[in-house]
Structures are given as C-alpha cells and as structure tokens.
Amino acid sequence: MTDSVASSVAAFVALLAAGLTVSIAAQRVRVPPAVLLVVVGAIFGSVWHIAPPFSFGPALLAVFLPPLIFEVAWNINLAEIRRAAGTIVTLALPGTLFSAFAIAGALSAVRVLDFPVALLFGAIVSATDPVAVVAVFRNVNAPARLKAIVEAESLANDGVAVVLYGIALALVGGSAVAWYTGALQLILSIGGGILVGTLCAIPSWLALRLIALAEYEVAGTVALAYIAYLIADRLGVSGIFATTAAAVVLRALLVRRANLDNRNDVDVFWNATAFIANAVVFLATGLIIDLPRAVHEPLLVITAVVATIGSRVALAFVAARDRAGRTTFVLSGMRGALPLALALALPQAIPHRAEIIDGVFAVVLVTLVVQGAPLEALVRRFYGPLTDRS
C-alpha cells in the first residue's frame, strides 16, 4: 500500500470514528445528529483547516447517495404514501419548482444575481435532506401520515431539484431552453428514473426468491441500490428516482415472503449502513463549509436564507392542516450534503460561481442549525416520544 493510499484510508477511518462519536453525543443531548456533525465539522474545518479525505462532487454522490436514498425508501410507509399521494406529488413537483423560482425571484429582485444564475442557485438549495429528517422522525411519535409526507417529499424533492439543476445549468451556459422543453425533460427524467428502478427491482426479486439466506438478500439490495442509480445516470435519467423506485418496488414484492427473519436482517443492515454513511457525509459537509465565506456576501446570504425558509413556510399549508404539522414540516426543510455537492460541482466558467458556493454554504448551515436543532424537541412536544405510542 502506497503512502498516499494509506494516508487516505487513515483519514477516512478517523473521519468515521469522529463522526460516530459526535453522533452518539448528539443522541445524548437530543439534537439531530446531522446538526451537531455539521457544526463540529464547520468549527474544525474553519479553525484548524481540516479537510475531508475526499472531494465533494458527482463521484461522492455516486458512492454515498445510493445507500442513503435506498435506506430511506426501503423503510417508508407504503400504505400512508398511497393515502397521501396527491399531497406528496404536489409538494415534490410544483412545490420544488415554486421553491426554486421563489428563491430565484428574491435574489434577482435585490439584484445580487441575474435571474438565470439565481434560478441555478434556487435549484441547488431546493434539495432538502431526507436522511436528517428520517433520523429525527424515528425517535418521535409523529402521525404516520405526516411522517410519510415529509419522508417521501424529501426523497422526490431531491430528484426534482437535481433535474432542475441540470436545466438551469444549461440556461446559464447559454443554451436556449423553452419552458415546454424543460418541462418535458423533467417529466422524462423522473419517469425514466422510476422505470429504470422498477425494471432493476423485478429481476432482483426473482433472483432473491430462489435464495433463503439473509446475507444474499443483503448483498442483493446493496447491488440493486448502486445498479439502479448508475444505470439511470448512464441513461441520463434521474438516479435518485431510480434508486427510490428500486427500493420501494423490491420491498413491496418481498413483503409477500414468509421469512421475516431475513427481512429483519436486511432492515438492520440498512439502518447501520445509513447511520455510518450519515455520520461520514455530514461531518465532511461541516468540514467543507468555510465559515468566513458563508458570511462573505451578506445581502445574498440573508436573501437566500429568508427566501428558502419562506418558501418552506408557504408549502407547509399544503403539507398539513394543523399548526403542529405545519411547524414540523417547516423545520424538516433542512439542507445537507446534496446542495453542497451540486454547488462545488459547478464548472469554473459559471458566472458568480464563488458567490453561489458562499450562499449555499450559508443556507446549508443556517437551515441545519436554525430548523434542525429544535426539530426533535418540538416534535416531541407536539406528539410525544416514540415510547408513548399505543
């Protein structure tokens, strides 16, 4: 093993150990782990200039995003999804578009960014983080319908935001994209991703029917998560929707099997995998955030944060009918690693690239701390802890 490889492995192991330690501390103080991980990472990164052992970008997404998305989709409540399908679709598609355009309109109104660049920024920060939200909801007694809406919306929202990011990137790059062309591209990317995920899940299910060993089911689900994502990405459709569809379809098909022990083993594996990936990704997210840069453009930062949270408040009236549900929905709109990865993956030639990255740093940090920190405490106050469930 070369020195560089050994150093990278050691750095990754150290990051993992630190992430797990911080996650355990977060559980003790009842703060969402994602919040404490990012705050600790930002302090270490800004004060001691510690960098993660990998760079944020498409390669990172291909490694960490499939298992994180798969685990959330694997554990989602399908019965509640069916009941709330209309609300979820409204929030995920028109809702994400509304959020992106509202943020873009605010930034262009105060003249910190031209509208095409502002729309690119809006698309980036419209991607909420399902992992951080799910981690909180598993410890509280929130209504099943509200949980399903927030979890499914955050999954679908990420997929829509990534597609919109590609369209906005083409606009900023000088390509002429008519609204109907963009709409068609969005529909094809989402539909294509769902189709790819479904087509990948069916042969996986047929293969797993012949095997009664839990370790084969675990290996099969891991392979499926990556295969669906990579095939979809290769075909130019949504990898996030492909991975989500693959998990949902395979889970629905496997439910009919009688071997509950195997399913429990698969559940335990994915919970552990998500916990580890969550710890690494969010601590690395904090290390990437440069605190001085996050306040470098105060007008852009203030406008972006207010517009981001404000658009979430407006969508809360679609998500829930009562004050507790709306408050929970607003606070669950945390941003995480995906917006950072999208911002840092921007080509160098993109106008105002540095300002976009600075603004994304700020939005991710503020939404995680301001919205994420009180989330679990308030949801517990509204609905009670999980142990109160009858």
Q: Locations of the language-model features?
A:
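Transmembrane helical cores of multi-pass secondary ion antiporters/exchangers
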Residues: M1-S390
